């Protein structure tokens, strides 16, 4: 018996080592692809890119820095109305990076990330800076601390299309992937789960991200993760590889908008599928799976950023780590404690500020920060009722517990990066999409467990 157990452990160890090596290889390949995309973008003729940026200028000037999405926005209260605010500020910065190259060395430009400026600072006015990028005489500053992968994609697209045409392509891809995800979820899990997926997106005003690729790129990555998972009925090992790809790609394309959803949304769908099909059998399996995927995503996300810093330092022969340290400390910092008593109060204020943006002012009757509390209260009542009637299977209790643990991911993100998420709450609040989704799914599962006659034709059917 001991011999067989030893053999089984030895086999599992070899499989684990093999998977780790596979993940590392895929990560290295991804970094190479990221570099090649950036170099290719820098090689493209600037005349073509510049012409299409110039042709798009009227649209940029008309829209302004912070236009409002018309479906849910009002003008009564900026802080509440920020629910429908479109981030053209960042969009213009990205396009500026796309339109600016020195023309000297594409490899150097790909790491240096030159940016056109009228006052030697990209914070001044992105609209004026972008206009300067279309002219011959302007200041050049650099931002080697980020990948700016979306800017590289923009440069490739601007060599063919104007911004309006790029937006049409982007919206088509975004909504097509959303529809495909809904269909896959409905076919492989349940139509009700598919509806909760859509409702969670709508609560956080998914429509806004359709107007701004820099806000929507994390959604495209998340949808791609869901579709990749369902394409072959992935198991533990395959899904961990997906998480590595998700984490690295997020670090490459996203500029701290809602990165955590590329982990949380695909993992939420995965544990539902694996729980339903008996791949994950108990709470230990669920927790191990959550920890393993979180590590895979986090290491890939952090590793991709670290590789950019190392490559920039080597290729540019410069010490960029001072810049990196300043930018990272700004995101992690407790500088906001000047207006708060301590870091804990700062964290609570950050969480509350993001939660308060969940619903538009027109629909916010009870205070949107209480929406999650209301869902939790109903969930607790249902769980209590299930225990009293002893009608809920242990497997569903384990799954509900795993979803509740997973729902905390954006809260952890807000606490760690409070320096960033407190200031930029008007778009970072969309990280709560995963939390809303997990809690609503928990509510659905517990409700079906409470009413036995519905359980058989519900989640377990």
Can you say where each PLM-predicted feature lies in the sequence?
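Juxtamembrane segments of multi-pass membrane glycosylation machinery
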Residues: 145, 149-171
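Membrane-interface alpha helices of multi-pass inner-membrane proteins
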Residues: 241-267, 288-302
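Membrane-interface helix-loop-helix junctions at transmembrane boundaries of multi-pass membrane enzymes
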Residues: 382-408
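Hydrophobic/aromatic-rich transmembrane helices and adjacent perimembrane loops
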Residues: 423-446
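Aromatic- and kink-enriched transmembrane "portal" helix at the membrane-lumen/periplasm boundary
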Residues: 152, 198-220, 246-252
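Membrane-lumen/periplasm interface segments of specific transmembrane helices
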Residues: 287-378
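Membrane-interface junctions at the ends of membrane-embedded or membrane-associated helices
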Residues: 11-21, 230-239, 272-288, 387-394, ...
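Transmembrane-helix motifs of polytopic, lipid-linked glycan transferases
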Residues: 171-193
